[in-house]
Amino acid sequence: MKYIFMVAGKGSRLQPLTFKHPKSMYKLDENTTLLQRMVGLIKKHDPEADIVLVTGHMHRRIEEQVEGVRYIYNPFYEVTNSIASLWFAKEELDADNVILIDGDIVMEDELVANVLCKPVDKPVVLVDSSIKTDGDYNVEVSGDQVLVMSKDLDNYYGEYAGVTLLDRESARLMKTEMESMVEDGYYDQWYENALVQLIFKNDFKLYYIDITNYDWTEVDSVNVLLLAKRIHTQELTEG
């Protein structure tokens, strides 16, 4: 399976902590960074994993510390968003299963094993329905399908958990829509907005998996950094 991590961003919301270190390189313990943990868990549960990191901000620091992966560099990370990073990696979307992962996500081992590393036959996003307020990028659903994802929803089912799983056909459609958006100048968008465009324009069916029973977090504040450490150290203790 193909795993594409988006790690080009500057981590502005964590400044000044990210002035000298990408937030994906935040240390969860003496020997393990946030990104090293996620890459390691994927390799544990999918030994044949093909892992690609799309870098930008302080890319050389990441390249020095994460081995056994391939790298693609977005030189325009200062003025673009994740849709442009994925555009640079667009040829990687030609695969039977593609998992797109935000680079600031920490997940418990069981979630990686049971969900992240399982093949899909339809497009799926991960959602946490326990988050009903103050979500960053939120999801409204009907039945088993996603209606819309947006930062601007007043009422929603849950928060998007930073992971999209695609089968070959949905990856192909995603690539086509992403290319169209970038060509039209929408390189400042999140790549997930291409999925929303597909829903509205093409009757694209996007599904979701609710991960509310698993431990995970998106590292976007100092308080959440502490939660990420707790998830990591708890597993070390239990292991």
Question: Model-derived features: where do they sit?
Answer:
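Active-site glycine-centered loops adjacent to acidic/histidine catalytic or metal-binding residues
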Residues: 9, 104, 221
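Conserved N-terminal catalytic core of the sugar/cofactor nucleotidyltransferase
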Residues: 2-5, 13, 32-96, 184
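Phosphate- and divalent-cation-binding pockets in alpha/beta enzyme and binding domains
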Residues: 13, 61-62, 110, 173, ...
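Conserved beta-strand segments of alpha/beta enzyme cores
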Residues: 24, 50, 70, 205-207
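Conserved alpha/beta core of the MobA/IspD/sugar-nucleotide pyrophosphorylase nucleotidyltransferase superfamily
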Residues: 1-3, 142, 160-239
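Glycine-rich N-terminal loop/short-helix segment of MobA-like nucleotidyltransferase
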Residues: 1-29
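Conserved beta-loop-beta/alpha segment of the NTase-like Rossmann-fold superfamily
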Residues: 62-136
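Conserved core of the sugar-phosphate nucleotidyltransferase
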Residues: 108-185
